[in-house]
Amino acid sequence: MKVYDSNMLRNISILGHSGCGKTNLIEAIAYTTKLTNKIPKLSDKVNMTYNMSLTPVEYNGYKFNLLDTPGYFDFNGEVISTMMASDAAVIVLDATTSIQVGTEKSFELTGESIPKLIFINKIDSEKANYKELIEELREKYSNKIVPMYIPIYEGDKFKAIHNILNDTSNLSAEFEEEAQNTKAMLMELIAETDDELLDKYFSGEELTKEEIQKGITIGIQNGDIIPVICGSTISN
């Protein structure tokens, strides 16, 4: 069994309302990191997590213990005890719904002390409302919530995911404007993590890739940036 230094270990709680895709997300990560060859599949029945379960995965030399938590509040004590051992949290939302009770409880439990990331699942559904869900999250919780990616659609059909730090010239006018506005929000949050970056940003200078990465890392660690990523766990 491989032994890891303590500074190379991370406990990550996976939180969210029941049915949002927490377990499927862990299965997708396990498949991507080659822990398993089982491809995540959508079940005909709703799978419920009753107890915390741990899935260890390795990435870039780090060992991540992914802690799957119950989405129903009959098991709230299980979630609280899991959070006490967590270094960070991933809050999973369903793109076809609005903020749910489990989402609210997840934000309540993580508070401001635990670094967090939001994963919006099921963006390939025709019922997905990603943009509206982002606006709802920012209005209800914090303008520190900012997308790192936006889904691209043709009509109601999902086509791709765009990294907002990438060039937008290949996007349609509608999505180019959305990407540029989102990038502006992120860049301001990045600049606010460091006085030197803030001075550089407001003087109109471009931040380097290294400065952007440093700002994102510091911002997440301090709770000044809550990044949003998106995807579909069953499409991996």
Model-derived regions, located:
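P-loop NTPase switch module centered on the Walker A-proximal segment
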Residues: M1-A85, A89-V92, I99, P147, ...
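P-loop NTPase catalytic nucleotide-binding module
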Residues: M1-C20, D94-S235
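Alpha-helix boundary/interfacial micro-motifs
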Residues: K34-L35, I39, D87, G111, ...
